Amino acid sequence: MASSATMLSSVATAACVAPAQASMVAPFVGLKSASAFPVTQKTVTGLSTLPSNGGRVQCMKVWPIVGLKKFETLSYLPTLSVESLLKQIEYLIRNGWVPCLEFSLEGFVSRDNNKSPGYYDGRYWTMWKLPMFGCTDAAQVVKEAAECKKEYPAAFIRVIGFDNVRQVQCVSFIVEKPE
């Protein structure tokens, strides 16, 4: 053990004292000239010329955070028509998910009662009746949503597709918003 330590220290001392040998490794003299590489594009000298894809890109506005709040899956699309709403509900029924209706007068998560998250901060909505187990008709779900809207006109109403085998919520989208 001691002999290997002295051997390492003597090698380290020899490496520090020994002069560099230029014949083993050539010194760095800089990058190769640009003429050695094929040039396929002209060089840009400033910001006057920017890359383009033929004019197909337009500047897109970022969604404003005040006044136009967004919700769940389909909230960035225009309001669903009755036909497209029926198609969405048929999709979740076709996948074997149970349609559920929920409503909330607030519609947004807010921490009015406490600084930590809890039950009354708006993330849990009230269920409208019971889940629609065995429902095979999308029109029945739309009828229930209209009935909920009639009773609570100032409420946000959403449809949830619940997978009762895996016990998870698979889809959720807003069907009614207050005026």
Swiss-Prot record:
Keyword check for Protein biosynthesis, yes or no.
no
Among the Pfam families in the record, one is RbcS
Where's it found, cell-wise? Plastid, Chloroplast
Q: Enumerate the InterPro entries for this protein.
A: RuBisCO_ssu (IPR024681), RuBisCO_ssu_dom (IPR000894), RuBisCO_ssu_N (IPR024680), RuBisCO_ssu_sf (IPR036385)
Q: Main localization of the protein?
A: plastid
User: Which Gene3D superfamilies does the record cross-reference, listed alphabetically?
Assistant: Ribulose bisphosphate carboxylase, small subunit
- Which UniProt keywords are listed? Calvin cycle, Carbon dioxide fixation, Chloroplast, Photorespiration, Photosynthesis, Plastid, Transit peptide
Q: Which GO terms describe its biological process?
A: photorespiration; reductive pentose-phosphate cycle
Q: Where is the transit peptide?
A: 1-58
Drop me one GO molecular function for this one.
ribulose-bisphosphate carboxylase activity
Note the superkingdom of the native organism: Eukaryota
Record's Gene Ontology CC terms? Answer: chloroplast
Functional description taken from the UniProt entry: RuBisCO catalyzes two reactions: the carboxylation of D-ribulose 1,5-bisphosphate, the primary event in carbon dioxide fixation, as well as the oxidative fragmentation of the pentose substrate. Both reactions occur simultaneously and in competition at the same active site. Although the small subunit is not catalytic it is essential for maximal activity.
**More details:** The basic functional RuBisCO is composed of a large chain homodimer in a 'head-to-tail' conformation. In form I RuBisCO this homodimer is arranged in a barrel-like tetramer with the small subunits forming a tetrameric 'cap' on each end of the 'barrel'.
Family the UniProt entry places it in: Belongs to the RuBisCO small chain family.
Q: Which PANTHER family match?
A: RIBULOSE BISPHOSPHATE CARBOXYLASE SMALL CHAIN 1, CHLOROPLASTIC, RIBULOSE BISPHOSPHATE CARBOXYLASE SMALL SUBUNIT 1A, CHLOROPLASTIC-RELATED
Subunit info here reads: Heterohexadecamer of 8 large and 8 small subunits.
Name used for this protein in its record:
Ribulose bisphosphate carboxylase small subunit, chloroplastic 2
Which organism is this protein's natural source? Fritillaria agrestis (Stinkbells)
> Its gene?
RBCS2
